[in-house]
Curated annotation (Swiss-Prot):
Its EC number is 6.3.3.1. Keywords: ATP-binding, Cytoplasm, Ligase, Nucleotide-binding, Purine biosynthesis. NCBIfam families: purM. GO terms for molecular function: ATP binding; phosphoribosylamine-glycine ligase activity; phosphoribosylformylglycinamidine cyclo-ligase activity. It comes from Escherichia coli O6:K15:H31 (strain 536 / UPEC). This is Phosphoribosylformylglycinamidine cyclo-ligase.
Length: 345
């Protein structure tokens, strides 16, 4: 018999030692996110979490999301520290619009070759997002898959579970004629529209690291982490009769606002109530993007829109602004049988 070389998993491109090193690196930041309801620690086959005792009829709310091609821009610019915040934000913001308090979060990180420093930066960002939203990072999957991704490219996905009192679910059914719409300012494009962002960068020939906008590199505007609205919105829900909340993500104004409107209602948005942050003006000009397309692709400075009764507006604005939000009245709800569910005028 001829001698054969003994192959290992590492020879095939999977470094178990690197995976173990990553777990050791992130344990500290993950521990900081722990809620009292979580049982056990990292390393189990599954994560255990009790329901908070304050709920009489708890309803679980779940969501999953990614960060789209904002990830490609982050990889190109070698900036991995905030993409994890984006990942958490996209999930927990979708939960809180239904009145849910996020409980726990899990992540999926896949790459062709595991770079411990990069993965650690991403997961540290995820932990920071969990801290900002008050949920526990209870586990995840790090998949090193040679041949599936180019070099050290990676992809991430997030999964979140929250809880809401059954009688306090926010589903838009209470929205009615005369309700007022309040906007919550965004931190930038958040995590949507980045295929168009990257196309605009390509066509314009712009280097986002050297192009200045409002006194800082364009890259800082484009990679600003998605704002997490959980804590301020939960405080609002405790004090104010909120009828509906829309998270402005993919599809922008035209597609997200109708998701929370009952039949025979229309949202009328007052375009003069705010000014677009400069990054959106730059994108529109550099890409020669039509106004309708801007509102379909980007949040244009508005991360969430909240519908509530007119008598609650002043109280809501004061509470939101006191909790660090940039909130303003952006429009109203009108009774209408028009097929156009959103009007911007």
């Amino acid at each position: 018999m001829t001698d054969k070389t003994s192959l290992s998993y590492k020879d095939a491109g999977v470094d178990i030692d690197a995976g173990n090193a990553l777990v050791g690196r992130i344990k500290g930041v993950v521990k900081k996110t722990r809620r009292p309801e979580v049982m056990g620690g990292l390393g189990g086959f599954g994560a255990l979490c009790a329901l908070p005792q304050k709920y009489r009829e708890p309803v679980l709310v779940s969501g999953t999301d990614g960060v789209g091609t904002k990830l490609r821009l982050a990889m190109d610019l070698k900036r991995h520290d905030t993409i994890g915040i984006d990942l958490v934000a996209m999930c927990v913001n979708d939960l809180v619009v239904q009145g849910a308090e996020p409980l726990f979060f899990l992540d999926y990180y896949a790459t062709g070759k595991l770079d411990v420093d990069t993965a650690s930066a991403v997961i540290s960002g995820i932990a920071e997002g969990c801290l900002q939203s008050g949920c526990s990072l209870v586990g995840g999957e790090t998949a090193e898959m040679p041949g599936m991704y180019h070099g050290e490219d990676y992809d991430v996905a997030g999964f979140c579970v929250g809880v809401v009192e059954k009688s306090e679910i926010i589903d838009g059914s209470k929205v009615s004629d005369g309700d007022v719409l309040i906007a919550l300012g965004s931190s930038g494009p958040h995590s949507n529209g980045y295929s168009l962002v990257r196309k605009i960068l390509e066509v314009s020939g712009c280097d986002p690291q050297t192009t200045e906008l409002d006194g800082k590199p364009l890259a800082d505007h484009l990679l600003a982490p998605t704002r997490i609205y959980v804590k301020s919105v939960l405080k609002l829900i405790e004090k104010v009769d909120v009828h509906a909340i829309a998270h402005l993500t993919g599809g922008g104004f035209w597609e997200n606002i109708p998701r929370v409107l009952p039949d025979n209602t229309q949202a009328v948005i007052d375009e003069s109530s705010w000014q677009w942050p400069e990054v959106f003006n730059w994108l529109q000009t550099a890409g020669n993007v039509e106004r309708h397309e801007m509102y379909r692709t980007f949040n244009c400075g508005v991360g969430m829109i909240i519908a509530l009764p007119a008598p609650e507006v002043d109280k809501a604005l004061a509470l939101l602004n006191a909790n660090g939000e940039n909130a303003w009245k952006i429009g109203i709800i009108k009774a209408s049988d028009s097929e156009q569910r959103v009007v911007i005028e």
